[in-house]
Amino acid sequence: VIARSGVSPANERTLVLLSTTKGNIGLLNGDPAKCDLNDTAEVVGRHFGAANRPLVISNACISGVSAIVVASRLIRSGEYDHVFVAGFDLLCDFIVSGFNAFKSVSPALCRPYDAARDGLTLGEAGGAVLLTTDRELSATGITVAGGGISNDANHISAPSRTGDGLAFAIGAALREASLGAAAIGMVNP
């Protein structure tokens, strides 16, 4: 993304923002110091010659979306013109055993839109996007109109059964985007 965009992290108006659910938590058994996400961000920042100290967003399953919301707000505030958002997650025994304890891992291939779906398939991934004020650099032309983040502090692994936290986040996103509920064309469950 950096090479394709031509935007340099060394630019004072550019930020690098990292997003991860847990980081490289598998290193806790070896060298715990290598698990510090701020240290990881510093290494990435040095590698790309970043002018600004990279930020880290680590909010469990909503880390990626949270990072996009934070990046869009930083751009909208005028603090930055460009924000590279890079997300990554790695598999390790801790992660696999956690999802197994929730009985959420499918014994078969993942079928997310199938009525007979029976869980998820874990994997490792990394990806990056550039949020920018420069429309010519935008690969998609997509604008983040608004975002909402909430924490209903209900249960370690389950949202509130009332949906209060979700309703708050949706309401906040709509308010930030200056949209009403009628503007929602699709909900992805």
Model region roles, listed by residue range:
Residues 1-17, 169-181:
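Conserved active-site "lid/cap" helical segment
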Residues 79-101, 106-110, 117, 147-161, ...:
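Acyl-CoA/ACP chain-elongation machinery
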Residues 23-70, 74, 79, 95-122:
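Conserved catalytic cysteine-centered active-site region
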Residues 12-18, 55-58, 83-88, 141-147, ...:
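Beta-strand segments within the central parallel beta-sheet cores of soluble alpha/beta enzyme folds
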Residues 3, 7, 46-49, 73-80, ...:
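Generic secondary-structure signature for well-ordered alpha-helical cores
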Residues 19-21, 47-48, 59-60, 86-89, ...:
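Fold-independent oxyanion-binding glycine-rich loops
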Residues 1, 44, 67-71, 75, ...:
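Buried hydrophobic packing segments
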Residues 109-179, 183-186:
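Condensing-enzyme catalytic core mediating Claisen C-C bond formation in acyl metabolism
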